[in-house]
Amino acid sequence: MKSLEEKTIAKEQIFSGKVIDLYVEDVELPNGKASKREIVKHPGAVAVLAVTDEGKIIMVKQFRKPLERTIVEIPAGKLEKGEEPEYTALRELEEETGYTAKKLTKITAFYTSPGFADEIVHVFLAEELSVLEEKRELDEDEFVEVMEVTLEDALKLVESREVYDAKTAYAIQYLQLKEALQAQK
């Protein structure tokens, strides 16, 4: 089978930020022709599908500047240097919601936009939740409203586009499928 790989000829970092770095790469395509690739480097992130013992999903409502709107999401955040995804998942759950989890299960990991970015999101299911005695502080630039919703209401939030991001829609549909499969047993 013919190779589909591109060979990097030159690489230039054109931006280094708090969250992302941006590179422009000159590449040789599989057919021998030259092209340029703009690549966003990201440390990765986690997302937490937190479900109470009563079956409610813990979600957060927050304004997202790139979208210029407020959306509803599952708790999520960026991996800090040297952090394991499990640690980040618990940290973000605690910071954003005031809950912690005794049981944390990795559901999946996926690349958000592999055509131009290397960001990977690790998605976890958090169960056996309890409220922290002392809530951890949010980042100074973070403002969220915590919500508890049923799966049915979460699906309505997806339909109404209040849930507008892939990680949250994925997590809600995962839970819907999980519950449907359990009901068949």
UniProtKB/Swiss-Prot annotation:
EC main group: hydrolase
GO MF annotation: an example: ADP-ribose diphosphatase activity
InterPro entries: Nudix_hydrolase, NUDIX_hydrolase-like_dom_sf, NUDIX_hydrolase_CS, NUDIX_hydrolase_dom
Keyword Lipid biosynthesis set for record: no
UniProt: Mg(2+) 3 binding residues: 92, 96, 142
Residues given in the record as Mg(2+) 1 binding sites: 76, 96
GO cellular component: cytosol
GO biological process, any: nucleoside phosphate metabolic process
Recorded catalytic activity of this chain's protein: ADP-D-ribose + H2O = D-ribose 5-phosphate + AMP + 2 H(+)
Cofactor note: Binds 3 Mg(2+) ions per subunit.
Any matching Pfam family: NUDIX
Enzyme active site: 140 (proton acceptor)
Positions contributing to substrate binding: 14-15, 37-38, 64, 113-115, 119
Cofactor(s) for this UniProt protein: Mg(2+)
Keyword match Metal-binding: yes
Position of sequence motif Nudix box: 77-98
Function: Acts on ADP-mannose and ADP-glucose as well as ADP-ribose. Prevents glycogen biosynthesis. The reaction catalyzed by this enzyme is a limiting step of the gluconeogenic process.
Stored PANTHER family: NUDIX HYDROLASE DOMAIN-CONTAINING PROTEIN (PTHR11839:SF18), UDP/ADP-SUGAR PYROPHOSPHATASE (PTHR11839)
Similarity section: Belongs to the Nudix hydrolase family. NudF subfamily.
Protein's name in the database: ADP-ribose pyrophosphatase
Species of the source: Bacillus subtilis (strain 168)
Taxonomic path: Bacteria, Bacillati, Bacillota, Bacilli, Bacillales
Gene this chain is encoded by: nudF
